[in-house]
């Protein structure tokens, strides 16, 4: 594999020599950093099983190498990488997989290790959504996830990825992660804090990642990380699991942050060793039981993961003085909910008891039941999925609901050809050789729902959201 020139400050190299265990070679570290990062994907098991995905993609000649810590994760090599971007494949557009760096699959693996089955989870720094979508898949869209993102510009990307992957159990918030300890104390069974960091582990993806690096900056970042982990720990219920992770390599932002938490709450913090997380995990194991992944160990990004348990309650933080404001939704009454459920089922949309109908003016929404305890405590940017808008003639079903709830086996499902599916993704109407009978048509490709169309004569009127429409070359090879 070709090499690329990485910028290394001298002080960084000195720090790495001191931080690296004697069992590892510093020359191997430098060599690994100079190699471009291997690409990796994670199969979205909410949409397709790993076995079916491998069968579906077998004709493409992709080389898929299993990732040891994530059974649905694979390193991927494609001979036609330049001909068609991975994100323009049909399987990516329909949410069958997520392009995710291999080491970033580690935190969620740790969160669910040893049979842990949390029902209410928070992802404190969630964008662009790789870990939130991984958590949702592990929960099988049940329970509830609070996915928070401080950066306003990244919340939109987070929602787009959640929607593409067919996820229904997520609530989005846009806050500084330091507010949650006071706002929602002891409310979560599990919390993932993939903390903002100096990014020392990402040089294989970004050779200039360390251009602005300094020891002083690391110390400032670590101070913020201590505040974030303290807040997260307060939001965790006693008995709950907290996973702390970064994509950086210095001890100040990693081990030291976790040790600070234990020193602060010595009777409430228990480190849960990760040496048995997957075969070979002991190669990255620290004396505290954390995983400190230098890039040469598994030929991936540099990463750090710690798992801990909250063994008892800790003193509460002062109650916040802000007002959340009135919640603009009201629950739909049972009789009306039954009528809506029946109408939705007629176009192939079904949901279970984990979701409950709420209404705002003419909008119908489905919220995860597990998030209702947080209503009135935090302000949501977006909650659950928008099911429909009501109008005089019935319901206007929403695209995100189709992707999350539709059964491709519905009687009104209509399978498109590759050329027709590509036209659909370009936002164009489709003219099939034999038009379906129904007026409301669940459009599928590769037996996956990709939208809802209105039949007008021999034409299927496109309802694909304008913001998702794709230009350029797609999966049939036509521009």
Swiss-Prot record:
The active site is at residue 247. Its EC number is 2.1.1.178. Gene3D superfamilies: 3.10.450.720, Vaccinia Virus protein VP39. It comes from Escherichia coli O6:K15:H31 (strain 536 / UPEC). GO terms for biological process: rRNA base methylation. It is an enzyme of class 2 (transferase). This is Ribosomal RNA small subunit methyltransferase F. NCBIfam families: nop2p, PRK11933.1. HAMAP family: 16SrRNA_methyltr_F. It comes from the Bacteria. Specifically methylates the cytosine at position 1407 (m5C1407) of 16S rRNA. InterPro entries: Methyltr_RsmF_N, MeTrfase_RsmB-F_NOP2_cat, MeTrfase_RsmB-F_NOP2_dom, Nol1_Nop2_Fmu_2, Nop2p, RCMT, rRNA_ssu_MeTfrase_F, RsmB/NOL1/NOP2-like_CS. It is found in: Cytoplasm. S-adenosyl-L-methionine binds at residues 125-131, 149, 176, 194. It catalyses: cytidine(1407) in 16S rRNA + S-adenosyl-L-methionine = 5-methylcytidine(1407) in 16S rRNA + S-adenosyl-L-homocysteine + H(+). Keywords: Cytoplasm, Methyltransferase, RNA-binding, rRNA processing, S-adenosyl-L-methionine, Transferase. GO terms for cellular component: cytoplasm. GO terms for molecular function: RNA binding; rRNA (cytosine-C5-)-methyltransferase activity. Its main location: cytoplasm. Belongs to the class I-like SAM-binding methyltransferase superfamily. RsmB/NOP family.
